[in-house]
Amino acid sequence: MHWKHALIARVDARVHAAPVPLPAEARLAAIAPKDLEYLRVHVSGTYEGKATVLVRAATGLGTGYWTMTPLQLGDGRQVWINRGFLPAGTRVQAAAATTPSGPVEVTGLLRPTEAGGSLLQSNQPGADRWYSRDVRAMAQARGVGAVVPVFVDAQMEKGAPVPGAAAPVPGLTQIQFPDNHLTYALTWFALAAMSIMALLFVWRRRRWNG
């Protein structure tokens, strides 16, 4: 149980730390995804709005899409940015139209790629139907080169606003750690308490009948 609590504490520290630059390609390749996940980063560059992909999402705001757009960085790399949530019924052209033109700055949380699709459905690039944020598959489908193997869940975006466009809602990253060890411990305590109560009930009943 202690290791799980230590993990939660480490991730909590990353989420609330000051943002750092996106790690170099060599570091991204050398470090395990779990050691980079939820790292708070700051990136700047120019969006490739025409390459926007909509990925199915279910959030506290309802069902809809994550708005994934590649950001061209100054060092030549491209990183997919989850700009935020748009409601069901949004078309990819409308989502792309919300993309700021010119330089932008994004602060957010680093996330590992979600290869293949969701638990229930596989991505269908040919039909432009996406159920997970698979950075390499999206890059291949949109002709995006030099893409890094992670994406950024945007918390804040600074750029020229697009007049009349309803921008995606950022900052909806869900960080959950199901504490199974604690659940098991509570379950065993509950079972033990129920057993004791049952024994007491039987003992008292025998006394009354005795």
Residue ranges and their predicted role:
Residues 1-210:
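Surface-exposed, charge/polar-rich loops and edge strands
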